[in-house]
Amino acid sequence: MARISGVDIPRNKRVEISLTYIYGIGRTTSTEILARTNINPNVRVKDLTEDEVIRLREIIDQDYTVEGDLRRAVQLNIKRLMDIGCYRGIRHRKGLPLRGQRTKTNARTRRGKKGAAIGGKKKATKK
């Protein structure tokens, strides 16, 4: 398995798809990288030469923020929003949607699961 940016990319998939296993690289970025390195996107990872893998590694490491660095940057951006107390930061803190979606109903993904509904028990009548 080729290891790029600390991620083992799948050997049996096309290079274009395999690169998307790296956090921060999607299909568009993947095709862009392959165009810059002059690698055919339809080639399987197992068929890449060592030189091609090295070229991929160099371009990704030099020009793209991926994996841990990108995750850290996103977390710091969210933390900054929460620290300055802006609307988006408050919504992050409360665990609610940020972009104006309704919350009276829906928003389940952001708000989390509700507990199981427990029906009221009937009290035994005295005879």
Curated annotation (Swiss-Prot):
This is Small ribosomal subunit protein uS13. GO terms for biological process: translation. It comes from Herpetosiphon aurantiacus (strain ATCC 23779 / DSM 785 / 114-95). It holds the Pfam family Ribosomal_S13. Residues 95-127 are annotated as: Disordered. Belongs to the universal ribosomal protein uS13 family. SUPFAM superfamilies: S13-like H2TH domain. Part of the 30S ribosomal subunit. Forms a loose heterodimer with protein S19. Forms two bridges to the 50S subunit in the 70S ribosome. GO terms for molecular function: rRNA binding; structural constituent of ribosome; tRNA binding. Located at the top of the head of the 30S subunit, it contacts several helices of the 16S rRNA. In the 70S ribosome it contacts the 23S rRNA (bridge B1a) and protein L5 of the 50S subunit (bridge B1b), connecting the 2 subunits; these bridges are implicated in subunit movement. Contacts the tRNAs in the A and P-sites. The keyword Glycoprotein does not apply. PANTHER family: 30S RIBOSOMAL PROTEIN S13/40S RIBOSOMAL PROTEIN S18, SMALL RIBOSOMAL SUBUNIT PROTEIN US13M. The keyword tRNA-binding applies. The gene is rpsM. Keywords: Ribonucleoprotein, Ribosomal protein, RNA-binding, rRNA-binding, tRNA-binding. One of its GO terms (cellular component) is cytosol. InterPro entries: Rbsml_uS13_C (IPR027437), Ribosomal_uS13 (IPR001892), Ribosomal_uS13-like_H2TH (IPR010979), Ribosomal_uS13_bac-type (IPR019980), Ribosomal_uS13_CS (IPR018269). It comes from the Bacteria.
